[in-house]
């Protein structure tokens, strides 16, 4: 938005006009499709926040792109040893990395039935994220084994591997807010959070890809 101070999300994943910036990379995700029980919940959250923001500060993600990252892959702009496959050179073309990952991913065992449950809404880092945690101990074990298997096969183990926070992204903040705008969004967050905390929605993860 011309004349307004941008956030760190501009120049990385987004352009200043709100359009998506070319950001090549790969990651393992579980898609959230319309037939998933959590889809309508996330759609409702997005709609309420959009009403509060009124197109001022956030770029809301299209519902067709909803997903939960299961384990991070690599991206072209972050060619650092700790964020790259230990099996591959840092200067390898991303297309070659993709080919390697696609072949190795075939060796990963399927994720068993695993349910996630609502935890909280996180607006702390210039984003709107809906945080989830495994619904029970078995779900937590399923995810740990799966992530460790993917990590071993692809050679990727980020510094936060054992503490990664599962979430579904709703929006990215592109422009800084006034104090009045911050207060309005905070009130919307509190209102939405109260509603979600009453029933703590849960859902089954679609097989990662």
Where does each model-flagged region fall?
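Histidine-dependent nucleotide/RNA phosphoesterase domain, centered on the 2H-phosphoesterase fold
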Residues: 1-209
